[in-house]
């Protein structure tokens, strides 16, 4: 499985969980906002899952990149997309039933503003052991990602779901491609990068945590 396919596997798992949660957490006609939607992969999947569940969603996705949003618009023509910042969401006060935040800035005050009382936001972050085997190669003293149930003012913590798998990279180019998709490529010591470049294959865990919060009524 190459780096793109391996990353895609994690994306599929995340989308399945996000779709299931969206159906569970919303009513018959939910207003849904995907913050930092990127190319719209999750946005389109969630919209279709809601429709297949017999709901009539109104859905929008925002991102700061106009070129990326052009790609997103091709994913699902019934979703509205707009260029906007996480810190200035183009939504009215108390107008959103469900907000998705997948690896995007946590603008908690804006989330609290746009969500209706009893509405939910889903927050996706790297799991405790995400890319652990790669980090063991890159660093002399690798660290485990901190996983915690963080309280946010005005919200009730509902649940957490863990997604884990192992990816198998059998080509040095795929290892480097995966490394280039991570923040580690900007802050790894030269010695660690050189060690990674010498690898011909790598089995590496991927792990994601999906946190659910409810706005207090």
Report the location of each language-model feature.
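Conserved class I S-adenosyl-L-methionine
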Residues: 29-38
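Conserved beta-strand signature within the Rossmann-like core of class I S-adenosyl-L-methionine
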Residues: 118-126
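Conserved SAM-binding loop of SAM-dependent methyltransferases across substrates and taxa
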Residues: 39-54
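Conserved SAM/SAH-binding beta-strand->alpha-helix loop
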Residues: 65
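Single conserved hydrophobic/aromatic residue that forms the stacking wall/gate
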Residues: 2-13
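Conserved SAM-binding strand-loop segment of SAM-dependent methyltransferases
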Residues: 77-89
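Conserved Class I S-adenosyl-L-methionine
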Residues: 163-217
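A short acidic, Gly/Pro-enriched loop at the edge of an enzyme's catalytic core
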Residues: 87-98
């Amino acid at each position: 499985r190459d780096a793109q396919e391996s990353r895609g596997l994690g994306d599929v798992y995340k989308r399945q969980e996000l779709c299931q949660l969206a159906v569970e957490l919303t009513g018959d006609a939910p207003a849904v906002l995907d913050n930092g939607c990127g190319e719209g992969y999750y946005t389109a999947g969630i919209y279709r899952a809601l429709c297949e569940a017999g709901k009539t969603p109104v859905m929008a996705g925002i991102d700061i990149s106009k070129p990326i949003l052009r790609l997103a618009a091709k994913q699902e023509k019934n979703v509205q997309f707009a260029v906007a910042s996480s810190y200035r969401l183009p939504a009215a006060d108390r107008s959103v039933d469900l907000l998705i935040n997948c690896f995007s800035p946590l603008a908690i005050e804006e989330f609290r503003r746009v969500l209706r009382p009893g509405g939910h936001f889903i927050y996706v972050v790297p799991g405790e052991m995400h890319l652990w085997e790669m980090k063991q190669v890159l660093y002399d003293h690798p660290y485990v990602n901190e996983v915690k149930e963080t309280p946010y003012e005005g919200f009730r913590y509902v649940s957490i779901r863990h997604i884990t798998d192992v990816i198998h990279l059998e080509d040095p180019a795929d290892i480097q491609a995966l490394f280039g998709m991570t923040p580690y490529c900007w802050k790894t010591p030269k010695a660690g990068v050189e060690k990674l470049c010498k690898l011909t294959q790598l089995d590496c865990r991927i792990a994601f945590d999906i946190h659910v919060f409810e706005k207090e009524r």
